């Protein structure tokens, strides 16, 4: 999960990383009040989870409260790379002498942690890596020892930071590593990391990506979710413990196992070409769970999408037997109630014959059992096209 800048900076401050004083505003009037409280020049910064805010006009310096009101009025509601600006961070302007770059990230290719730092900050780091790769220091971090003062100094020196910034940057890097580890982050980035005119090293910007697999250790992360940016069906599925991603098609998909569901998306897309371009409406992996409750939750979410005209339930029985899935489907339809959208069901594997028998004897008009995956995909696409 990516954090907004203001959320990242709050996390930084909690761990002792120096950041400019600032507050979040959702209206121009709030921006004016914050600027009055801070005094002097302030910076009004669009809060979106996208880069290039400055180039898009989403970062503006204001000379005082009234100017902050005007700048916030111009920024709020802007579209930056497909993201609408709903809030701005109003913070004290900094006296910038030099700009650097620093980050800690999970290096998946080498299965370790990586520190990256550069004397060339304030620009897209990808640009630095492409045009001047020697300016970007890369230091692998031993997860058993982490980043202490000596390691932090090694990173700062490797980045060729000036002597005036080495000590301050080293202290900041140790604290930044603490954020990375304690927050269970996969990325912690400061760009720019600045040296001020009076010799202080400050995180002027902040980017943090949290590992959602570690959410069980961080119940407080629920408060960080950007509800406005999350699809309501995806949020509902997450609350139910379901792995659901909304797509743009008309055929709802339920499967057990990510690989099978991905294959199902492909087969439905191919079959849909024959029926006016019908496509998958979602990705929904129920994993090993085929209980009535899981099925009911899955169907309820999929059928809440008005674009869904048919549902393809594709199950390969393994540890979860097909007869259990069939019973789950029958009970789920009773729980959901009043379902008119056709369900094409393909069962294969463990106890598939028994599963088909259960569906047949249930005599549910909306359930259409099909033996093959290709045949089921074709029927699901055909039914969706007919209902469009």
Curated annotation (Swiss-Prot):
Enzyme superclass (EC): ligase
Keywords for the protein's UniProt record, in alphabetical order: ATP-binding, Ligase, Magnesium, Metal-binding, Nucleotide-binding, Tricarboxylic acid cycle
Residue ranges constituting the ATP-grasp domain according to the UniProt record: 9-236
GO cellular component, one term: succinate-CoA ligase complex
Cofactor, free-text remark: Binds 1 Mg(2+) ion per subunit.
UniProt: Mg(2+) binding residues: 191, 205
Keyword S-adenosyl-L-methionine: no
Reactions that this protein is recorded to catalyse: succinate + ATP + CoA = succinyl-CoA + ADP + phosphate; GTP + succinate + CoA = succinyl-CoA + GDP + phosphate
BP terms from Gene Ontology: succinyl-CoA metabolic process; tricarboxylic acid cycle
UniProt cross-references to Pfam families, sorted A to Z: ATP-grasp_2, Ligase_CoA
InterPro entries: ATP-grasp (IPR011761), ATP-grasp_succ-CoA_synth-type (IPR013650), ATP_grasp_subdomain_1 (IPR013815), Succ-CoA_synthase_bsu_CS (IPR017866), SUCC_ACL_C (IPR005811), Succ_CoA_ligase-like_bsu (IPR005809), Succinyl-CoA_synth-like (IPR016102)
Pathway note: Carbohydrate metabolism; tricarboxylic acid cycle; succinate from succinyl-CoA (ligase route): step 1/1
EC code: 6.2.1.5
Residues bound to ATP: 45, 52-54, 91, 94, 99
Subunit structure: Heterotetramer of two alpha and two beta subunits.
Family stated for the protein in its record: Belongs to the succinate/malate CoA ligase beta subunit family.
Protein's name according to its UniProt entry: Succinate--CoA ligase [ADP-forming] subunit beta
Naturally occurring in which organism (per UniProt): Parafrankia sp. (strain EAN1pec)
Gene: sucC
């Amino acid at each position: 999960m990516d954090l907004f800048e203001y959320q990242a900076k709050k996390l930084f401050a909690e761990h002792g990383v120096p950041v400019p004083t600032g507050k979040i505003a959702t209206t121009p009037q709030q921006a004016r009040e914050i600027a009055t409280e801070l005094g002097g020049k302030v910076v009004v910064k669009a809060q979106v989870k996208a880069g290039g805010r400055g180039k898009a006009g989403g970062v503006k310096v204001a000379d005082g409260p009234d100017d902050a009101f005007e700048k916030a009025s111009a920024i709020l509601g802007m579209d930056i790379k497909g993201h609408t600006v709903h809030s701005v961070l109003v913070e004290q302007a900094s006296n910038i002498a030099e700009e650097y770059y620093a980050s800690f990230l999970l290096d998946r290719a080498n299965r370790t942690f990586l520190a990256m730092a550069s004397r060339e900050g304030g620009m897209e780091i990808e640009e630095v890596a492409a045009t001047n790769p020697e300016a970007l220091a890369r230091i692998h971090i031993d997860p058993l020892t982490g980043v202490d003062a000596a390691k932090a100094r090694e990173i700062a020196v490797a980045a060729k930071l000036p002597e005036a910034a080495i000590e301050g940057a080293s202290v900041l890097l140790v604290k930044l590593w603490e954020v990375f580890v304690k927050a269970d982050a996969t990325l912690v980035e400061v760009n720019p990391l600045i040296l001020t005119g009076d010799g202080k090293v400050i995180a002027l910007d902040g980017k943090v990506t949290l590992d959602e697999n570690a959410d069980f250790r961080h119940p407080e992360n629920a408060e960080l979710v950007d509800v406005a940016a999350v699809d309501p069906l995806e949020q509902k599925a997450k609350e139910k413990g379901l792995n659901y991603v909304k797509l743009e098609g008309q055929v709802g998909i339920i499967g057990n196992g990510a690989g099978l569901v991905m294959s199902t998306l492909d087969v439905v897309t191919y079959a849909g070409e024959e029926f006016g371009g019908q496509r998958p409406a979602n990705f929904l992996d129920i994993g090993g769970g085929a209980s009535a409750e899981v099925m009911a939750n899955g169907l309820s979410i999929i059928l809440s999408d008005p674009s869904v005209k048919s549902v393809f339930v594709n199950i390969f029985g393994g540890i979860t037997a097909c007869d259990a899935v069939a019973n789950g489907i029958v009970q789920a339809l009773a729980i959901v109630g009043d379902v008119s959208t056709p369900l094409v069901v393909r069962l294969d594997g463990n106890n598939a014959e028994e599963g088909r028998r259960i569906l047949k004897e249930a005599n549910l008009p909306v359930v259409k059992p099909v033996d093959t995956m290709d045949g089921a995909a074709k029927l699901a696409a055909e039914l969706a096209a007919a209902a469009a």
